[in-house]
From Swiss-Prot:
Ranges for region Disordered: 85-110
Gene: S
Region (Pre-S2): 119-173
Protein source organism: Hepatitis B virus genotype E subtype ayw4 (isolate Kou) (HBV-E)
Record note on modification: Isoform M is N-terminally acetylated by host at a ratio of 90%, and N-glycosylated by host at the pre-S2 region. Myristoylated.
Transmembrane spans: 181-201, 253-273, 348-368, 375-397
Biotech use: Systematic vaccination of individuals at risk of exposure to the virus has been the main method of controlling the morbidity and mortality associated with hepatitis B. The first hepatitis B vaccine was manufactured by the purification and inactivation of HBsAg obtained from the plasma of chronic hepatitis B virus carriers. The vaccine is now produced by recombinant DNA techniques and expression of the S isoform in yeast cells. The pre-S region do not seem to induce strong enough antigenic response.
Protein name: Large envelope protein
Entry comment, domain topic: The large envelope protein is synthesized with the pre-S region at the cytosolic side of the endoplasmic reticulum and, hence will be within the virion after budding. Therefore the pre-S region is not N-glycosylated. Later a post-translational translocation of N-terminal pre-S and TM1 domains occur in about 50% of proteins at the virion surface. These molecules change their topology by an unknown mechanism, resulting in exposure of pre-S region at virion surface.
Family note: Belongs to the orthohepadnavirus major surface antigen family.
Region Pre-S: start-end pairs: 2-173
Length: 399
């Protein structure tokens, strides 16, 4: 897209010359090659600029930057462009208000010149100002001498110690603060790691629970209804819009309660084994029958026996018989008495427990039938409880 410019010739005709100013390469207004004729000879011009040179700023009759890179308004020849001499730029003059090199720091003026108000407080003026009770309250603690006699000025060490005794200790060492925070951070990290491992137990128990409803197949939650259609997924990972989400939350809640109860039982059994429950242990090597007055079962065990036993008081003619029983039995008895004393409605459950104990053969038959029915997949059913087996083993051995 060339720029057109109409050039008036001497015989009165106008010739439209494409790109006459030479803004594009290989276009110059050189009269020697018929630039202003009908047939300009662009290809035989030996003074054509190449494209790499076309990007340079030309120097012409109007100074640098005012002429096209392929010739000026008056043609290509140097006579038409004029001669321009390029002079090197003079360096900037050196600063007159600065000397080379680092200068010495000027001497600090004396205090009497910079802070004349500080020189007004000499020793005599200061002691006179201390006679004012308002000024004395700033320098002496409450309860000090209120007489006109001024105490001698304390030394620097005693003054600093008195100031710290009133306003507090100096700033503590940051290294001790960092070491104090390191321990709790490590405990928090270990607790978070254990929590992530413990949270996998409810998920495994939930998978086992839901697998009981899908015998012989993979558990799949359809999750299809008119309000919230969702895709098929596992019943242990229902989204909130799934109808089975509330049942999943209920199962997880029951599982958490079960784990909490199991941990509580383990803790109480451990306390009973350590002799910290209010039971009456028997001294090793003593007789199981005592003829003295009945002892109360409220004293703490002294740890004299490896496996603490409990004292069961059975009054008979003013005497009691001490029967050693397992500590877990003592724990159950203690827990039942503690709960019955605080919840009176638990006494209504005694007939039901006695009736259930009479159905023990039926219960055993039910357990045998369940083992026969789920025998092939017994390992899959018990696999969520594998992390709990070491705890049960320790309880079985040491209690």
């Amino acid at each position: 897209m060339g720029l057109s410019w109409t050039v008036p010739l001497e015989w009165g005709k106008n010739i439209s010359t494409t790109n006459p100013l030479g803004f594009f390469p290989d276009h110059q207004l050189d009269p020697a090659f018929r630039a202003n004729t009908r047939n300009p000879d662009w290809d035989h011009n030996p003074n054509k600029d190449h494209w790499t040179e076309a990007n340079k700023v030309g120097v012409g009759a109007f100074g640098p930057g005012f002429t096209p890179p392929h010739g000026g308004l008056l043609g290509w020849s140097p006579q038409a462009q004029g001669m321009l001499k390029t002079l090197p730029a003079d360096p900037p003059p050196a600063s007159t208000n600065r000397q080379s090199g680092r200068q010495p720091t000027p001497i600090t003026p004396p205090l009497r010149d910079t802070h004349p108000q500080a020189m007004q407080w000499n020793s005599t003026t200061f002691h006179q100002a201390l006679q004012d009770p308002r000024v004395r309250g700033l320098y002496f603690p409450a309860g000090g001498s209120s007489s006109g006699t001024v105490n001698p000025v304390p030394t620097t060490a005693s003054l600093i110690s008195s100031i710290f005794s009133r306003i507090g200790d100096p700033a503590p060492n940051m290294e001790s603060i960092t070491s104090g925070f390191l321990g709790p951070l490590l405990v928090l990290q270990a607790g978070f790691f254990l929590l992530t491992k413990i949270l996998t137990i409810p998920q495994s128990l939930d998978s086992w629970w839901t697998s009981l409803n899908f015998l012989g197949g993979a558990p799949v939650c359809l999750g299809q209804n008119s309000q919230s259609p969702t895709s098929n997924h596992s019943p242990t990972s229902c989204p909130p819009i799934c109808p089975g989400y509330r049942w999943m939350c209920l199962r997880r809640f029951i599982i958490f309660l079960f784990i909490l109860l199991l941990c509580l039982i383990f803790l109480l059994v451990l306390l009973d084994y350590q002799g910290m429950l209010p039971v009456c242990p028997l001294i090793p090597g003593s007789s199981t029958t005592s003829t003295g007055p009945c002892r109360t079962c409220m004293t703490l065990a002294q740890g004299t026996s490896m496996f603490p036993s409990c004292c069961c008081s059975k009054p008979s003619d003013g005497n009691c018989t001490c029967i050693p029983i397992p500590s877990s039995w003592a724990f159950g008895k203690f827990l039942w008495e503690w709960a019955s004393a605080r919840f009176s409605w638990l006494s209504l459950l005694v007939p039901f427990v006695q009736w259930f104990a009479g159905l023990s053969p039926t219960v055993w038959l039910s357990v045998i039938w369940m083992m026969w029915y789920w025998g092939p997949s017994l390992y899959d059913i018990l696999s969520p409880f594998i992390p709990l087996l070491p705890i049960f083993f320790c309880l079985w051995v040491y209690i």
